[in-house]
Amino acid sequence: MTDATSNLDSHGRPLGVLRLSLTARCNLACPYCCPDSRDPEGMLDLQDQLRLIRVACSLGVHTVRLTGGEPLLSDRLEPLLAAIALDRPAGLKELALTTNGVLLSPERALRLKCAGLDRITISLDGADAASVARMAGLQGGTPAGQSLLDQVLVGLEAARSAGFNSSHGALKLNAVIQKGRNDDQLIPLARLARDRGLELRLIEYMDVGSRNGWSLAQVMPAMEMVQCVSSHWPLDPVGRSSNSTTSRWRYRDGAGYIGVISSISAPFCGDCNRIRVTADGQVFTCLFASQGVDLRPYLRTDESETQLRECLSELWTRRSDRFSEERSLQIDKEKSHAEMAYLGG
């Protein structure tokens, strides 16, 4: 077996996080994500997923985050959690989920908690009906936005009631902020999160994929977001932990924390420890990559898992990605990227 400590990429970064997409489909149509309406062919089955997680953990992965599309649309979610719980890899410290929360009923939240899920992050890009409708790509206008907002808030409370403790970081709120579209929602979202004891993470609008018409002019820099929030509720810096995507700030009045993810204005490529595997088994070593490597031949023909382990290990040790840093140097400006919903964020 490969020694997990020997798996450093060409920049000395260890492998630590596997983001595993369960589906490319989504029940929303957020314009910055542009999800697909159907899944790709050749989806990984349960045994493929389990083998992948087991081998990834043997190479140093300590956190598995289940993503989409919208993972709650996948009929693979609960069976996967149940199977992991039966034989959880020794190195797997955290099993997390990112969702829009629409399908997170009280019953389902409890099932997920009982099945061994450790953390849930819910995405919400507005705090009023019109903004929610606009950012989710809804056709029904304000009434549809209000219905969606109500569902997400129910999902948040369902997760809390199921035992996902926000004060311990087990329940967080994500928001993508796009200048000119929902930057007016910064303070309302911060207020919503503060009132509910949630840590809000504000994400810069990213140039992932080619469908969303990304422009640098639409990016609100993280520090500008921080200054905006701090003008209402003073903040003190906490910093960014090694390998984390989030720089955190503490509310001076004791109302918790807020975070920013600044992949455009202040890239954190230097200690990125993530790989992403799509629902059809393509592995990507960078969110901004244009092409992945198909793992299915290794997953389905090698019961010993040796070839899969060697493939992942070689892929990681040869890894040299630092796209966000290169973006600032105007390198590879015309390079195409895989789509956000396909990669799983």
UniProtKB/Swiss-Prot annotation:
Q: Which domain of life is it from?
A: Bacteria
The answer, when asked if Iron is one of the entry's keywords, is yes
What SUPFAM superfamilies does this protein map onto? Radical SAM enzymes
Pathway assignment: Cofactor biosynthesis; molybdopterin biosynthesis
Q: How is the cofactor bound?
A: Binds 2 [4Fe-4S] clusters. Binds 1 [4Fe-4S] cluster coordinated with 3 cysteines and an exchangeable S-adenosyl-L-methionine and 1 [4Fe-4S] cluster coordinated with 3 cysteines and the GTP-derived substrate.
Q: Which keywords does this Swiss-Prot/TrEMBL entry list?
A: 4Fe-4S, GTP-binding, Iron, Iron-sulfur, Lyase, Metal-binding, Molybdenum cofactor biosynthesis, Nucleotide-binding, S-adenosyl-L-methionine
Q: EC number(s) in its UniProt entry?
A: 4.1.99.22
What PANTHER family does this protein map onto?
MOLYBDENUM COFACTOR BIOSYNTHESIS PROTEIN 1, MOLYBDOPTERIN COFACTOR SYNTHESIS PROTEIN A
NCBIfam families linked to this entry = moaA
How this chain assembles, per its entry, is: Monomer and homodimer.
Q: Which family does it belong to?
A: Belongs to the radical SAM superfamily. MoaA family.
This chain's protein is named: GTP 3',8-cyclase
Q: Which organism is it from?
A: Synechococcus sp. (strain CC9902)
Query: Lineage of this protein's species?
Result: Bacteria, Bacillati, Cyanobacteriota, Cyanophyceae, Synechococcales
Gene, per the UniProt record: moaA
